[in-house]
């Protein structure tokens, strides 16, 4: 593809009034809009859009069709839905969420959305069009597999690397677009097939979203996960695995801390706290809460003084009520966070 190309040079001079002149090339914008050769699967997906409803926009699917027909080279995926199906119903409105290709600049995205506004004249009834940004939910996996080393000539490290590759391939093939669900059983089936020495596997699944706080300022965030959140359960001696909600580390007054739901001896609630990573001391007692039924998590008066790891975001992970499947709706996209995922081999002498 020629996308992002921005350095151009003439291959020859031009003659003006008998004299050779060297051309000077100025680039006003990098090349965009190119696309890979279509696969059979993409042809099956896109072909109906080329004959979309005779240029009439009646249903949400019609909006998707017309937009894709005109801007398909800029768009990785698109989803449209009626305002009546929105979490906060808005009748007379069609919502569209566009996941642009990675090489499309913010300026081009804005210009594309403005151009799409013009297609409203194709609607047979007066509808408003509103754009909703895609909401990315990352899957974290804590995978454990049982292996009998005597049943293979390969090392455990080699088997682990193969499992890591298979797991990444599963997410690449099955997630990353609208309406693409994560199914734990499908992933574990592929892992069990990596080697005859792999006797079984299991995985703990967490949903993760990210916030970008302004340091030294009180921040407020509302996260909506694509599935209900598990209910906190009291435990006499809770461990880190018992937390329903937990974040990666950030700084508060120079000390590493995490966001955790309240979880101590025989007490477990949906209240969120800032807790010292080193000592477990509660630094801020209440910075929000989460609703287990709706999957909505609210953070208020959150004031970090720094973010670790050279990143600008903080990862907030929640344990889903049903770890078997995470099925996104509307503008939700499921992705995979390999860096927040782990693989642990458990050796056994059993052969079945």
Predicted segments with their positions:
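Extended, beta-strand-rich, solvent-exposed assembly scaffolds of outer structural proteins
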Residues: 173, 248-315
């Amino acid at each position: 593809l020629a996308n992002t190309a921005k350095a151009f040079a003439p291959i020859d001079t031009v003659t003006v009034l008998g004299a050779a002149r060297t051309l000077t090339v100025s680039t006003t914008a990098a090349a965009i809009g190119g696309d890979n050769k279509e696969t059979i699967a993409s042809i099956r997906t896109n072909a109906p859009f080329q004959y979309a409803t005779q240029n009439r926009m009646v249903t949400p699917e019609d909006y998707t069709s017309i937009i894709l027909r005109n801007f398909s080279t800029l768009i990785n995926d698109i989803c449209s839905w009626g305002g009546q199906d929105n979490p906060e119903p808005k009748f007379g409105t069609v919502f569209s969420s566009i996941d642009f290709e990675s090489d499309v600049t913010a300026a081009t995205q804005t210009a594309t959305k403005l151009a799409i506004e013009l297609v409203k004249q194709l609607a047979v009834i007066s509808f408003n069009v509103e754009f909703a940004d895609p909401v990315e939910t990352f899957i974290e996996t804590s995978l454990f597999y049982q292996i009998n080393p005597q049943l293979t000539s390969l090392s455990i490290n080699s088997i682990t690397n193969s499992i890591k590759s298979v797991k990444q391939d599963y997410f690449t093939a099955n997630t990353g677009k609208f309406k693409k669900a994560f199914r734990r059983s499908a992933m574990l089936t592929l892992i069990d097939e990596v080697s005859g020495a792999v006797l079984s596997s299991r995985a703990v699944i967490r949903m993760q979203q990210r916030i970008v706080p302004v340091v030294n300022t009180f921040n407020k965030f509302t996260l909506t996960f694509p599935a209900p959140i598990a209910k906190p359960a009291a435990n006499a001696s809770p461990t880190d695995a018992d937390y329903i909600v937990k974040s990666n580390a950030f700084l508060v007054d120079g000390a590493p801390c995490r966001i955790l739901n309240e979880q101590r001896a025989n007490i477990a609630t949906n209240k969120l706290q800032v807790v010292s990573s080193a000592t477990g001391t509660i630094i801020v007692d209440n910075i929000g809460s989460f609703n287990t039924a709706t999957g909505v998590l609210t953070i208020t008066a959150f004031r970090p003084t720094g973010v670790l790891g050279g990143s600008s975001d903080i990862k907030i992970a929640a344990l889903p009520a049903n770890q078997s499947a995470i099925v996104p709706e509307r503008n939700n996209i499921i992705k995979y966070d390999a860096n927040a995922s782990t693989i642990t081999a458990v050796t056994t002498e059993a052969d079945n």
